[in-house]
């Protein structure tokens, strides 16, 4: 009995010592907010399914449904937060299996609590007085919770209207000093300036740590760095055959993975995930350094322009900017397959 008591005391003592360390590790996970135009091209569902397979690597603080689709894609302005909730529901079914392989997984209830609705309308005309939304207010709240050392990493998969509304509100309510303090607390990876307001934001909201992943002016839009997630390199890893074998066969979460997207000139028309590089960039195991986007990693490689924003590397001397992502495809696809296998009850 004395031995048992001694062992119990030792275990309690060790646990007490490790508790602050465990909390520190959790606190060091990147803070992430996602704005998605889910409800148009189904590649947003693809990207969200992959993200939830890595949910333990982040502190996911916001999942925002912005105006669905790209400009002109849908006949009316809508938001589709229910599609986010559907995927979270599937995640909840495989969560017990995921927890057998790693720690830090958020509960489904927590993820549902950070799903917020944005503006079904987009562009400059819908930014300003009277245009705040649940999403824009929540973004401000989450940014305010951070520091210049603990940024909120904002991945914009669709339009930037709700983000811009949050910026507008803070700048107009807090003045120059308040804005200067606020702008140090976040950084952005924007996929393609989908609402067409990047130039206006750059002038209106100075000092932002902003990465705009988009093909340079005058180039084919399909040459953007982020499109290396599905273009160039070994495209067989984007095929439906690969997806069926490694993703859709792994339980409730993988079963929701869409198999038809707009991938031209990729012949497989299956995996696109055009938004995934935005959060790959902040993923610790992805190799990128968010403090220095010129360094390579799964989220691409970028250069700083004279205006302070980060942009795609130019295509020159035989360099295809998309290769900055596609070169890692064997690595990130193998890792994705491994994590989705964790969703199975008999996985090892």
Describe each model-derived feature in a short phrase.
Residues 7-20:
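Bacterial N-terminal signal peptides
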Residues 1-5:
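N-terminal secretory signal peptides that target proteins for export/translocation
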């Amino acid at each position: 009995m004395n031995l048992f008591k001694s062992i119990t005391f030792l275990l309690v003592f060790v646990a007490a010592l490790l508790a602050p360390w465990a909390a520190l590790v959790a606190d060091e996970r990147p803070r992430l907010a996602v704005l998605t135009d889910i409800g148009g091209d189904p590649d947003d569902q693809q990207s969200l399914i992959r993200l939830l397979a890595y949910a333990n690597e982040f502190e996911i603080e916001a999942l925002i449904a912005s105006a669905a689709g790209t400009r002109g894609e849908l006949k009316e302005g809508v938001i589709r937060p229910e599609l986010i909730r559907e995927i979270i529901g599937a995640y909840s079914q495989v969560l017990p299996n995921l927890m057998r392989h790693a720690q830090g997984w958020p509960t489904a209830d927590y993820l549902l609590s950070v799903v917020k609705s944005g503006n079904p309308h987009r562009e400059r005309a819908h930014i300003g007085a009277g245009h705040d939304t649940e999403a824009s207010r929540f973004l401000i709240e989450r940014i305010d919770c951070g520091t210049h050392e603990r940024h909120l990493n904002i991945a914009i998969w669709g339009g930037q209207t709700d983000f811009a509304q949050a910026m507008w509100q803070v700048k107009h309510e807090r003045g120059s000093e308040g804005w200067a303090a606020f702008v140090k607390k976040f950084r952005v990876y924007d996929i393609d300036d989908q609402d067409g307001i990047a130039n206006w934001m750059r002038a209106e909201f100075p000092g932002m740590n902003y990465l705009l992943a988009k093909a340079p002016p005058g180039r084919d839009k399909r040459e953007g760095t982020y499109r290396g997630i599905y273009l160039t390199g070994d495209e067989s890893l984007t095929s439906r055959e690969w997806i069926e074998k490694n993703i859709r066969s792994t339980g409730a979460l993988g079963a929701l993975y869409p198999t038809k997207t707009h991938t031209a000139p990729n012949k497989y028309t299956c995996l696109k995930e055009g938004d995934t590089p935005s959060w790959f960039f902040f993923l610790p195991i992805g190799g990128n350094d968010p403090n220095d986007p010129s360094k390579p990693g799964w989220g691409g490689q970028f250069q700083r322009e004279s205006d302070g924003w980060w942009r795609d590397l130019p295509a020159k001397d035989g360099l295809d900017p998309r290769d900055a992502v596609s070169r890692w495809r064997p690595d990130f696809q193998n890792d994705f397959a491994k994590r989705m296998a964790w969703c199975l009850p008999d996985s090892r």
